[in-house]
Regions:
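FNR/FR-type flavoprotein reductase catalytic core
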Residues: 71-223
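Short, surface-exposed secondary-structure boundary micro-motifs
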Residues: 39, 87-88, 237
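Conserved small/polar residues in nucleotide/adenosyl-binding loops
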Residues: 297-302
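A generic structural signal for residues embedded in beta-strands
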Residues: 36, 84-85, 234
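Short, Lys/Arg- and Gly-enriched loop/turn segments at beta-strand edges
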Residues: 42-49, 89-97, 244
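Local cysteine-cluster metal-coordination motifs and their immediate loop/turn environment
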Residues: 220-248, 286-293
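Ferredoxin-reductase
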Residues: 1-80
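Short Fe-S-cluster ligation motifs
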Residues: 245, 250-296
């Protein structure tokens, strides 16, 4: 069992938890994720690692309640436990694999949307600790949904906060802020965008026009974390990739976002059905088609 050491509500329906998971904390690197499961009846929930403390043996996760499984997580309190806390999974951020001196020569910008701020934070923190400067553009729909602003301010070289409704910081979206900086003569050599699919799509559209290489962290539904079920497959550069083993980071200019968003919408619908089952006291496992593992490609039958 993996006990919850700390729980904090960051914003409406957004929570932070520190979980005691010594092995995961010892091996974790920025960009990786874990898959958690509350109990035997719980679904497997993929969550990017927000932070980790090797000495304390804790891993920090941030999640938003968007369906049945995350709604159950929100009811957990300090002292409660997860049955499974599997990780670290996925490949670490490409940036931490690069030569530090070469990184210092680059002008790097992170663009975080909503809960996407959580997986951006450990990367920016790691770069800061290694003497690498980077700017961060982080935003949300409104001021009350902003998270980790002060934490990010401590590690970012320049922090630009945006809100869609203008209640805090720059009035507009992250792409608007990037365009304004570009118009003022600010140039970037590398961009990392993490957030909702639609946000990453339009960031990549802009950065492609501006000629800025861009990495995105894909977060479609992941189930087994090994690539066996096929739930997290996407098209990248015309090839099938699996977010849980090949990613979660990919070249944003090569990702087929339209196909990825179509798949994500399908799972949101099924998650909604799962919410109804939970509220009615019913659980449903196996043979439901949620993971995509039973999908087959067949040739037309001969006539």
């Amino acid at each position: 069992m993996y006990p919850i050491i700390k729980k904090e509500k960051l914003a409406d329906k957004i929570y932070l938890m520190d979980v005691k998971a010594e092995r995961v904390a010892k091996s974790a690197k920025p960009g990786q994720f874990v898959i958690v499961k509350i109990d035997e009846e719980g679904e497997r929930i993929p969550l990017t690692i927000c932070d980790y403390d090797e000495k304390a043996g804790t891993v920090t996760i941030v999640f938003q309640t968007v369906g049945a499984s995350t709604e159950r997580m929100a009811y957990l309190e300090e002292g409660d436990t997860f049955q499974d806390f599997v990780g670290p999974l996925g490949c670490p951020s490409d940036l931490i694999e690069e030569d530090i001196e070469e990184l210092k020569k680059k002008k790097i910008v992170f663009i975080a949307g909503g809960v996407g701020t959580a997986p951006v934070y450990p990367q920016v923190k790691w770069l800061h600790e290694h003497g690498v400067d980077c700017d961060v553009i982080m935003g949300s729909k409104t001021k009350d949904l902003l998270i980790l602003v002060e934490e990010m301010r401590k590690v970012a070289t320049n922090l630009y906060v945006t809100t869609d409704d203008g209640t805090y910081g720059f009035h507009g979206m992250g792409t608007n802020q990037l365009q304004e900086l570009w118009d003022k003569g600010v140039r970037y050599d590398h961009c990392v965008a993490i957030g909702p699919m639609i946000m990453m799509k339009f960031v990549c559209k802009l950065t492609k026009e501006l000629g800025i290489p861009t990495v995105v962290s894909m977060n479609p539904i992941m189930v087994d974390g090994t690539g066996m079920c096929g739930a997290c497959r996407l098209m990248v550069g015309g090839e099938v990739k699996f977010a849980c083993v090949d990613g979660p980071e990919f070249d944003g200019h090569q990702v087929d976002f339209d196909q990825a968003m179509k798949r994500q919408l399908q799972y949101k619908t099924e998650e909604g059905r799962a919410m109804l089952k939970l509220q009615e006291g019913d659980t449903h496992h196996g043979g439901c088609g949620q993971c995509g593992g039973c999908l087959l490609y067949t040739s037309p039958s001969p006539r």
